[in-house]
């Protein structure tokens, strides 16, 4: 019989093994030469084989019996599984079997036992796991899980647990963002989903209940940018409606002006604000293709000339503006020149 302590010990050991695996991979990447690298690779293979055997034994003892139905959940064990998975997620651990499949099982259990808090937590976890996935249909699954939470918004006013209420609040954020990430809906539907979130965040009853716990105005600003800015950034002009662009211009324009107040040198602002705003102006016909490309190139040239590699303090290289130019912006410039070649003179 699997006990609460068994489950707690399982996740403690499983996390330890995941850490060990990450450390082995990290050491492999730090090899000084090919000979050392090959020796580390051989050691890694042996270690990973033993680790796999141990993990499989742990899963066979404490997880698979529940997934197969051989052992049934009860309230205590279900709550224990959920608590452990929440902690694992907060610590950055990911694993399909130990986390995703167990959470899917828990979701069904909490739904049947009418544990609304547990069910909402499970829907939130599953939405996040599938959003991070790359498999076919992962985006649709992620959106569906967050949508299920949104559809339970009336429960928000009945739930006393702040952690559960936050899952509902963040579902209104994640639902449109996931729709953008996986390009799942039309502009019209995306605006409807966005407005649904705005209505919830601006509901006086919501602000009265949790206005001291969350900054809803900041949440609205971030959501507007994440949806409008990122959708425009990843779309062709023909795929974006005028209504969407007009709203995007308002949001991106406000961010652009705010950055200019901090520093009048427009080339010093974050690249995502500068480039997305001008892309929006180009799509609206307020900036010619030639002006857009030349201004875009001037922005990139300024950064390449004034920001050597690693010069942005406190910023990881892959988040630096130089890295973004190399991997994103130069490609975007070439794409615009080719795709809109009749307009570039």
Named regions from a protein language model:
Residues 36-46, 57, 71-88, 116-133, ...:
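Amphipathic alpha-helical repeat scaffolds of TPR domains
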Residues 15-22, 34, 49-63, 90-105, ...:
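Helix-turn-helix repeat elements of alpha-solenoid scaffolds
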Residues 63-74, 105-119, 151-165, 199-220, ...:
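Flexible helix-coil transition and linker loops at the boundaries of alpha-helical arrays
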Residues 2-42, 71-75:
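N-terminal leader/linker segments that initiate helical-solenoid repeat arrays
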Residues 1, 9-10, 24, 37-39, ...:
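Intrinsically disordered, low-complexity regions enriched in serine, threonine, proline
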Residues 6, 210, 214, 240, ...:
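N-terminal cationic leader/targeting segments used for protein routing and processing
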Residues 78, 99-100, 105, 119, ...:
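A generic structural signal for ordered secondary structure
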Residues 307-310, 315-316, 326-334, 345:
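Eukaryotic alpha-helical solenoid repeat scaffolds
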């Amino acid at each position: 019989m699997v006990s609460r302590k068994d489950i707690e010990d399982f996740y403690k050991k499983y996390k330890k093994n995941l850490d060990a695996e990450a450390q082995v991979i990290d050491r492999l990447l730090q090899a000084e030469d090919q000979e050392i690298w090959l020796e580390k690779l051989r050691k890694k293979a042996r270690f990973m084989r033993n680790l796999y055997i141990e993990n499989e034994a742990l899963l066979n003892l404490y997880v698979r019996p529940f997934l197969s139905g051989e052992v049934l959940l009860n309230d205590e064990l279900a709550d224990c599984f959920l608590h452990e998975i929440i902690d694992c997620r907060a610590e950055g651990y990911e694993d399909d079997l130990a986390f995703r499949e167990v959470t899917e099982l828990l979701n069904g259990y909490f739904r049947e036992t009418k544990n609304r808090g547990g069910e909402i937590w499970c829907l939130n976890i599953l939405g996040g796991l599938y959003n991070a996935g790359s498999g076919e249909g992962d985006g649709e699954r992620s959106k569906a899980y967050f949508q299920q939470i949104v559809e339970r918004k009336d429960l928000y006013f009945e739930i006393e647990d702040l952690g559960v209420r936050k899952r509902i609040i963040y579902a209104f954020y994640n639902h449109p963002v996931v729709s953008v990430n996986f390009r799942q809906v039309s502009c019209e539907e995306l605006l409807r989903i966005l407005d649904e979130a705005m209505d919830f965040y601006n509901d006086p009853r919501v602000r009265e209940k949790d206005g001291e716990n969350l900054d809803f105005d900041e949440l609205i600003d971030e959501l507007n940018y994440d949806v409008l800015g990122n959708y425009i950034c990843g779309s062709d002009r023909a795929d974006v409606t005028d209504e969407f662009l007009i709203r995007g211009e308002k949001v991106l324009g406000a961010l652009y002006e705010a950055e200019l107040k901090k520093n009048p040198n427009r080339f010093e602002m974050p690249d995502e604000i500068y480039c997305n705003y001008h892309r929006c102006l180009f799509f609206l016909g307020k900036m010619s293709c030639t002006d857009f490309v030349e201004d875009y190139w001037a922005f990139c040239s300024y950064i390449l000339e004034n920001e050597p590699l690693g010069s942005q303090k406190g910023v990881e290289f892959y988040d630096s503006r130089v890295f973004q130019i190399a991997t994103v912006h130069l490609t975007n410039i070439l794409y615009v020149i080719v795709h809109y070649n009749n307009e570039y003179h």
